[in-house]
Amino acid sequence: MVQEHTESFWGGIIKSMGLVFGDIGTSPIYTLTVIMTLTKPDAEHVLGILSLIVWTLIILVSVEYAWLAMSLGRKGEGGTIVLKEILVRLLKSGRQVAFVGFLAFMGVSLLLGDGIITPAISILSAVEGMRLIPGWENLAQGVLIFIAAVIALILFIFQFKGTDKVAGAFGPIMVIWFGALTLSGIVSIAGTPEVVSAVSPHHAVTFLMHNGLAGFFILSEVILCATGGEALYADMGHLGRKPIIRAWYFVFSALVINYLGQGAFILRNPNETNILFSMVKSQAPILYIPFLCLTIMATIIASQALISGVFSIVYQGITTRILPLMKVDYTSTHLKSQIYIGSVNWSLLVAVIFIMLIFKKSENLAAAYGLAVTGTMFITGIMMTMIFSHTTKKWKVPIALAVTLIDLVYLTANFHKLPHGGYWSLILASIPLAIMIIWTQGQKALYRALRPLDLDTFLLSFGQIYAKGHNIPGTGLFFVRETAVVPPYVIHCIIRSNIIYERNVFVSLNRSDEPFGVKANLTKGIGPGLDSFEILAGYMELVDIERLLKKKGIEEKVIFYGIEDIATNNPFWRVFSTIKRQTANFVQFNKLPVSKLQGVVTRVEM
């Protein structure tokens, strides 16, 4: 029993390192390299920057995410959409709910934009380490971009197969990576032990006071050390809170030791540029190529974790009706979270390669990086503060508020990146944001334009037609949004066309504000020959409608569903109509048997 507990204890930590800490774990590759291009490599500046890095990791990752955010899970699930679902239940005012909805849209959009920049900067920065291999010093930047693009291409092609089989290796590889970071850090610190004093926050305060506005703008690069911190909370549903927190103790220690080691190396070699790679090469030239291979593997794992995270966010968005339906494939038979969304995968690949070609170097990419991360952190901070103020944990409000204000400071510092490439963060985030706004507003307008009939009025006509006895043998299913209101396509089928079966079943699938759990309720006899089958599922559940129907003894002959043909002169609704046509419909999303499907077109004026 004790052995089993020990295995699960360490197993959880190792898994977390592979699935959660890839992004933040690969930040040492480029963080100090980028910062040192903007400041002097003297003792005061180096110690000040190291102190800022250490305290950024403590405040923004340990306090904001590991402590505050992770205390707000819903059945173990975390993330921006979960915060929104918690808040919507707590708030009374419609305006507040609308504000929270918009915040969630912004948070999700920034995270999706970040999903493009992270693989690009991680893979490109690792590949750039090839220039330190003897004889490869003059490797053209175009060649490095090509190698990085090929790695990205292979990574995205692999998504379709599912990463289930290789995911077991992610944890052990990342354990070796963090071990290598720790070891190289310790060796470097031993040569210049005075860097350890950077742990004291007075160095950070002194740096900011002495450097004024320039010091303030350095914060926009310091935040690079905390990119990926949001994964602690977002991935909570995959692994659970405790393993992630335990793993963070080890990861935090490895990161701090390595950053201090890099600082010590800068003090001894103030003219070096590619700091992590130069440090490792100076310590063990013979191990440099294996370390470079390990770095590339670590960045691939970091990118993989982020791609899986994007799939998960998009799936949450689909089931909570803030994103259009898309074709989803399940790549694992035993892991619920292992999904593949082809349209998202290929869009990400194109965007990642495009960003590599636009920015060319990882240090240029750093200009676009950070804005999305700090924006997400600030939004998380606002939502957490609102939640704590509406619950019994009011004592956490001042702490959450203080952290949110610090997020705002980092976000403000990042605004100066806008002219230098930071605008790409906003462009990338604006695409999903526009889709979400158009989709949610379009769905509401479409629902109003459809003018559904209330059930009681429908039953008057239905009862008369059913009583005539000209009914088709078997069972017909009709998909509706809710049983109480009948959509026009059902009226067209049954009332106008007299397509009526011996048994007719209204089927509705709605999502609860809990992540998991499925309830299926069959109500017989809501009208003569008419039943209602209502499914209420958690927004992370993968629902097998056919299996649920069979469990209740419903063997359908045909499945009817509505298709809206939208006619409009409004450019906003034209975009909505195009999105609706190009994305999956309800029956495609839920993989219902094609041979039984019968789509009924309704023309709608919007």
Curated annotation (Swiss-Prot):
Membrane topology: Multi-pass membrane protein
Transmembrane regions listed in the UniProt entry: 18-38, 46-66, 97-117, 140-160, 169-189, 204-224, 247-267, 286-306, 339-359, 368-388, 395-415, 418-438
Localisation per UniProt entry: Cell inner membrane
Catalytic reaction equation(s): K(+)(in) + H(+)(in) = K(+)(out) + H(+)(out)
GO MF annotation terms: potassium ion transmembrane transporter activity; symporter activity
Keyword entries, A-Z: Cell inner membrane, Cell membrane, Ion transport, Membrane, Potassium, Potassium transport, Symport, Transmembrane, Transmembrane helix, Transport
GO CC terms, sorted: plasma membrane
InterPro entries recorded: K+_transporter, K_trans_C, K_trans_N, Kup
Keyword Transport listed: yes
Family membership noted in the UniProt record: Belongs to the HAK/KUP transporter (TC 2.A.72) family.
Function, in words: Transport of potassium into the cell. Likely operates as a K(+):H(+) symporter.
Name of this protein: Probable potassium transport system protein Kup 2
Source species of the chain: Geobacter metallireducens (strain ATCC 53774 / DSM 7210 / GS-15)
Gene: kup2
